[in-house]
């Protein structure tokens, strides 16, 4: 499947007044095709005036198998979530730990996870004094020598009490790229920053140039997404920066893969920069 055939994430939250049981630590595993998935529960959290419950989807893979990030690159299928049937749920936000780039076996490159992964969820209950029942139909793909689709149907009752999987969820959340501003230096302790984004013409091709600042000698990768899921931008490739400042990395990619009728002018790109010690996310406008 090419990047132009990528399906978007579907997140559907349903609400119910039906009372649910007390919280659990994890659902049963649902597995097939060299992979299995389950829901896990953590403790309650709060951001500003919003109270939420920590949960996650844990995916276990056989050795040598892999699965995909929200944007899978040149080939692959991102996970999809259908939360229809959940009870006492106002909203659900899926978080994505930092992925890595790997060869897709067909001459292209994909983005995903080379091994087990936990995808954190933040669940906002309709009534925070009551448990919430989380139901999800998960669709995803797993790849070894061949790629196969996988599905799981999972349910778990969540409460505000910390469960046995709290530390696993916190560790997964720590790997989620943090949003920072374009051009920021050492914001909130981050070692990475996206310094500039601009377009340039190279012969008949228009391309995007991104400069990333990082500690000298530390490997860095960069991924680019468009404003909607039907954008299929190529993976940025590293190149030698015009500025020889220590730690400055330059990435380029052709301005290709736009959906029919879409215009690059003014489009907001989401850029994810990753190193062994940091992961950040930056929004940048193409002017």
Predicted regions and their residues:
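Extracellular/lumen-exposed scaffold segments
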Residues: 22-287
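Positively charged n-region of N-terminal signal peptides that target proteins for export
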Residues: 1-4
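Bacterial N-terminal signal peptides
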Residues: 7-17
């Amino acid at each position: 499947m090419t990047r132009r055939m990528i399906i978007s994430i579907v997140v559907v939250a349903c609400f119910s007044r039906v009372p649910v049981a007390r919280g659990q630590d994890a659902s049963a595993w649902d597995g097939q095709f060299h992979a299995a998935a389950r829901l896990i529960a953590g403790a309650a959290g709060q951001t500003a005036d919003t109270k939420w419950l920590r949960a996650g989807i844990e995916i276990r893979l056989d050795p040598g198998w892999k699965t995909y990030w929200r944007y899978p690159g040149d080939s692959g299928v991102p996970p999809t979530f259908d939360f229809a049937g959940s009870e006492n749920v106002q909203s659900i936000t899926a978080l994505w730990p930092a992925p890595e780039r790997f060869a897709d076996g067909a001459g292209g490159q994909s983005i995903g996870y080379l091994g087990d992964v936990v995808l954190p969820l933040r669940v906002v209950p309709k009534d925070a004094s009551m448990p919430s029942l989380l139901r999800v139909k998960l669709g995803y793909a797993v790849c070894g020598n061949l790629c196969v689709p996988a599905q799981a149907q999972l349910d778990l009752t969540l409460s505000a009490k910390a469960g046995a999987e709290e530390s696993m969820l916190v560790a997964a959340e720590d790997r989620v790229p943090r949003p920072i501003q374009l051009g920021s230096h050492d914001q909130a302790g981050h070692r990475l920053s996206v310094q500039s984004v601009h377009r340039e013409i190279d012969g008949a091709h228009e391309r995007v140039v991104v400069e990333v600042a990082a500690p000298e000698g530390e490997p860095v990768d960069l991924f680019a997404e468009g404003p909607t899921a039907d954008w299929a931008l190529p993976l940025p490739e590293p190149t030698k920066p015009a500025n020889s400042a220590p730690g400055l990395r330059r990435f380029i990619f052709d301005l290709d893969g736009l959906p029919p009728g879409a215009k690059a002018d003014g489009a907001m790109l989401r850029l994810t920069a990753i190193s062994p010690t940091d992961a950040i996310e930056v929004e940048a406008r193409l002017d």
